[in-house]
Amino acid sequence: LKGKPFDKIMFTKTYEGITFDPIYTWRTGPSATDKILPTDDYPGMGDFLRGATVNGYKCAPWGIAQACDETLPKENNELLKHEIDRGSTVYNVRIDTATADGIDVMDAEKPGDIGVSITALEDMHTLLDGLDMEKIPFMMYAGTSSLRMLALVAATLKAKGKDVSKVKGVIGANPIAQLIKRGKLNQPLEELYDEMAESIRWTRKNAPQLRTIFVRSDIFSNGGANAVQEVAYTFAIAVEYIREMQKRGIDIHDIAQSLQFAFNTGATFYIEIAKLRAARQVWSNIMKAFGAEEKDRSCKIHARPAMFTKTIFDIGVNMLRETTQIFSAVVGGVDSYE
């Protein structure tokens, strides 16, 4: 210890106010009779603490969703195909800021800053050319509104003779997060809620396997929130969306089937596992309060690496950190990872 206090060296305090002991055993706890593992709940049922499905990853492994952020639609299309050949199992398209905010590329300050620019139907035709959309899930964070991207995708698939009802995945909006990030919106929030409701109505009728609300936690995680705050703020946004959709006559079942979450995974291994498990449990209780049936109380979770744990100087270190973050996400029971 070199003269340093035992508690300071051997016990680790986290941002969440939790103190880690140096070692844990089966008898760790206030009482020797405490049980670590839950015995009255199973995966795929109850509050979904232990997972959203009964069989876990035995029937369907977690999705591998490498983000493709090339600026031009043709180059992004080639990258999507390349990633599938390399082992990805999800088409994950990252759009630029202008597209996410509904701004024409000609009027954008920095077109293609973080992803592909999509302005016209021709761009979407190029982006989706040769992609097997009926078999491989599709993922796109659409920014303020999913209606624009949804319409372009549907029109493209129809022109190609594809069955849009077989498309699964998410083309999801998150207008409140965009408002927090940008400080402003190009449309009134009420109009965006109207578009969100229309997206749900259309997909439930025409593409029931496609989700249109994508509530992501990265705006909070990258902004300094701890695990507890990250889950709380993310679910607060989701609750707001539920209430606004109910005002517009959307049934809680349809809302539940339209929601998808994305959480960042950080460096504190056990905290990240606990965060994902707790998130499913908390969300189950929230949906129960809204009167949802048990099958609608689970939440579909996509996980992403926390960027604040990465360095620009050493790729090898980033790979090691990424490995532990992926491991914690998988143990936590995510549906897909980016």
Model-derived features: positions:
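Contiguous, well-ordered alpha-helical segments that form the cores/surfaces of helical PPI scaffolds
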Residues: 151-155, 281, 285, 321-328, ...
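Extended amphipathic alpha-helical segments enriched in small hydrophobics
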Residues: 272-284
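Active-site-adjacent loop and "lid" segments of alpha/beta metabolic enzymes
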Residues: 228, 313-325
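Catalytic alpha/beta active-site cores
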Residues: 1-266, 271, 293, 297-304, ...
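Short conserved micro-motifs at the rims of enzyme active sites and ligand-binding pockets
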Residues: 76, 273-274, 312-315
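Flexible, glycine/threonine-enriched loop-and-boundary segments that flank and lead into catalytic domains
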Residues: 284, 306-317
